[in-house]
Curated annotation (Swiss-Prot):
Name the record gives this protein: GPI-anchor transamidase
UniProt topological domain (Lumenal) ranges: 28-368
Subunit-structure text: Heteropentamer. Part of the GPI-anchor transamidase complex, consisting of PIGK, PIGT, PIGS, PIGU and GAA1. Interacts with GPAA1. Interacts with PIGT; this interaction, via a disulfide link, stabilizes the expression of GAA1 and PIGK and links them to PIGS.
Keywords per UniProt: Calcium, Disulfide bond, Endoplasmic reticulum, GPI-anchor biosynthesis, Membrane, Metal-binding, Signal, Transferase, Transmembrane, Transmembrane helix
Region Autoinhibitory loop, residue ranges: 231-236
Residue spans, topological domain Cytoplasmic: 386-395
A GO CC term assigned to this protein in UniProt: GPI-anchor transamidase complex
Pfam annotation, one family: Peptidase_C13
Catalytic site positions: 164, 206
Molecular-function GO terms, alphabetical: GPI-anchor transamidase activity
Annotated binding of Ca(2+), by residue: 79, 82, 118, 120
Cleavable signal peptide: 1-27
Main location: endoplasmic reticulum
UniProt source species: Pongo abelii (Sumatran orangutan)
Length: 395
């Protein structure tokens, strides 16, 4: 009898050890599932790019915004997902020695006002009211689709703003201001209305860090060109145009973005380091406490690129129709019968590099360790209840 009790205790101890080991394995699987859950599950990217300044001497603010616009388009975000707001038309300004151009580099090396620029809000349309309406979706029904931010709860949104500001405010066209409280409340409305998944806010203005101090909504990451009490300085004066071409912070951010491609694994921590005080003169700042993910795990392309990897080309492609594919028999009584085979135009496209989309994560299922742990628990309860002498009835 004593031997049977000893064997029963030993079996119970063994089952308990197995249960703990299997439980730890199950816990590790659950942690992996949780990590996958907190990855950005966005399905689309949007950009709202805003220049709030008028007049020729603010040429650099328009160039800032158009440079960011050029970068996000190059990385795959289409015009249909970009809301571009320019408070003044520098390309057609009478003082512009090169009409229909806006340059961001010295000696007129890079024209950021190309043939395909689509400005959604221009001149006096760029107001605090219109900006807040775009963010919150409170716009008249007659507003065209191109002027709407049609985001949802799976959208990652980049919001870039540049202009003149101060401690807790940003000026719009020297006639009105938006405060950091109004901006924070607008972002909260967006969160409550499920208009974004994650939001990246970048502002290039004097005392820019004051604009994100009042943020309180989740999943927001913010960057600014200067701390409270600091000015954000301009860069690259051009004697031919007579004004500075860009601001320092945006200039170095754009230099950084020029090295990014749609398949890049560069993360947000790298973006935080692009403009040290030795280059910017001001002290750039960032805020990540509201953001759920670690910035080192957030790719630059999660905000600046397209979810669907695309390759942009300016080459004109002439697609040839295959005569064999085009052959199809039409019924006498049906005039619009579909072709027998689809045209395989994709094979003719000059794809330089195929960028594979990450496979979709499988639906959650109980990990293997969980099942093993459950069996160990059943065995331990059996030993406790009946003892080892009943094992012969099982086997």
């Amino acid at each position: 009898m004593a031997v049977t009790d000893s064997l029963s205790r030993a079996a119970s101890t063994l089952a308990a050890v197995l249960l703990l080991s299997f439980g730890s394995v199950a816990a590790s699987h659950i942690e992996d599932q949780a990590e996958q859950f907190f990855r950005s599950g966005h399905t689309n990217n949007w950009a709202v790019l805003v220049c709030t300044s008028r007049f020729w001497f603010n040429y650099r603010h328009v160039a800032n915004t158009l440079s960011v616009y050029r970068s996000v388009k190059r990385l795959g975000i289409p015009d249909s997902h970009i809301v571009l707001m320019l408070a003044d038309d520098m390309a057609c300004n009478p003082r512009n020695p090169k009409p229909a151009t806006v340059f961001s580099h010295k000696n007129m090396e890079l024209n950021v006002y190309g043939d395909d620029v689509e400005v959604d809000y221009r001149s006096y349309e760029v107001t605090v009211e219109n900006f807040l309406r775009v963010l919150t979706g409170r716009i008249p029904p007659s507003t065209p689709r191109s002027k709407r931010l049609l985001s949802d709860d799976r959208s990652n949104i980049l919001i870039y703003m540049t202009g003149h500001g101060g401690n807790g405010f940003l000026k719009f066209q020297d006639s009105e201001e938006i405060t950091n409280i109004e901006l924070a409340d607008a972002f909260e409305q967006m969160w409550q209305k499920r208009r974004y998944n994650e939001l990246l806010f970048i502002i290039d203005t004097c005392q820019g860090a004051s604009m994100y101090e009042r943020f309180y909504s989740p999943n927001i990451m913010a960057l600014a060109s200067s701390q409270v009490g600091e000015d954000s300085l301009s860069h690259q004066p051009d004697p031919a145009i007579g004004v500075h071409l860009m601001d320092r912070y945006t200039f170095y951010v754009l230099e950084f973005l020029e090295e990014i491609n749609p398949a890049s694994q560069t993360n947000m921590n790298d973006l935080f380091q692009v403009c040290p005080k030795s280059l910017c003169v001001s002290t750039p700042g960032h805020r990540t406490d509201l953001f759920q993910r670690d910035p080192k795990n957030v790719l630059i392309t999660d905000f600046f690129g397209s979810v669907r990897k695309v390759e942009i080309t300016t080459e004109t492609i002439k697609l040839q129709q295959d005569s064999e594919i085009m052959e199809s028999s039409y019924k006498e009584d049906q005039m619009d019968e579909e072709l027998m085979e689809p045209l395989k135009y994709a094979e003719q496209l000059p794809v330089a590099q195929i960028i594979h989309q990450k496979p979709k994560l499988k639906d959650w299922h109980p990990p293997g360790g969980f099942i093993l742990g459950l069996w160990a628990l059943i065995i331990m309860v059996f030993f406790k209840t009946y003892g080892i002498k009943h094992m012969k009835f099982i086997f």
